[in-house]
Amino acid sequence: VLGGTGAMGTHLVSILAEAGMKVDVTSRQELADRTNIHYIKGNVHNISFVKSLLAQNYYNVIIDFMIYTTVEFNDRYWLYLNNTDQYFYLSTSRVYADAALITEESPRLLDVTTDKKYLATDEYALCKARQEDLLRNSCKSNFTIIRPYKTYSEIRLQLGALDKETFIQRILQGHSAVIPMDVMSHTTTLTYARDVAICIAKLIGNKKAMGDTFNIVTSKNIKWMDVLDIYLNVLENKMGYRPN
């Protein structure tokens, strides 16, 4: 599991280990091994580290939570496809263009936008779509593309584009938090990271998942203002007063 110490990765690693699988996890930090889990310290952005890792081991499954530039991914996706039975690429539901109903077949921004200035960038939604295309055009089919959206977990809380370190930490330190109110009226989905991890685990070794794409997102939606109210209610209960 590449970069498997985040919100989704932490849950997925535990699920796989509890199922009796031997799991290697890359991390930038030195972490203690646990039952069926071996942590390997290294920088996956360093392709020499990746080559060394794959030269020493053959993995039945590679699950990739890393965020690459398109140039970086172009240099390594063949390494992954050629050194595993099934490669999981974590994309994002942000690749989609606006639509009333979004499915895996819905148009992506990359496919429909005519904004040349935007297309000249490697913005997150574009780079993920381009990297999906590299896999699809590879003439290989031993990959599975996962498109989650906003997730939350014991180590991740989000509010629009803000992470907990930006707003909750400030509040707990006694400071006011600046919240972009224009975002608060927007609707989102928030999926528990463990639910995403459970779905990914069920796709491992599934031949029908090869070469396919899966949105793993809750069907329930919520306004960011309501999410903010939930956070404020919990903080008020903890702190004894309602934060600003």
Show where each model-derived region lies.
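NAD(P)-cofactor binding segment of oxidoreductase domains
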Residues: 53, 57-115, 129-132
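Substrate-positioning beta->alpha
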Residues: 159-168, 180-205, 211-212, 226-229
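N-terminal Rossmann NAD(P)H-binding glycine-rich loop of SDR-like oxidoreductase domains
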Residues: 1-19
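Conserved beta-loop-beta element that borders a ligand/cofactor-binding pocket
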Residues: 91, 132-157
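Rossmann-fold cofactor-recognition segment
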Residues: 33-46, 66-68
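Short-chain dehydrogenase/reductase
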Residues: 102-132, 161, 189-190, 221, ...
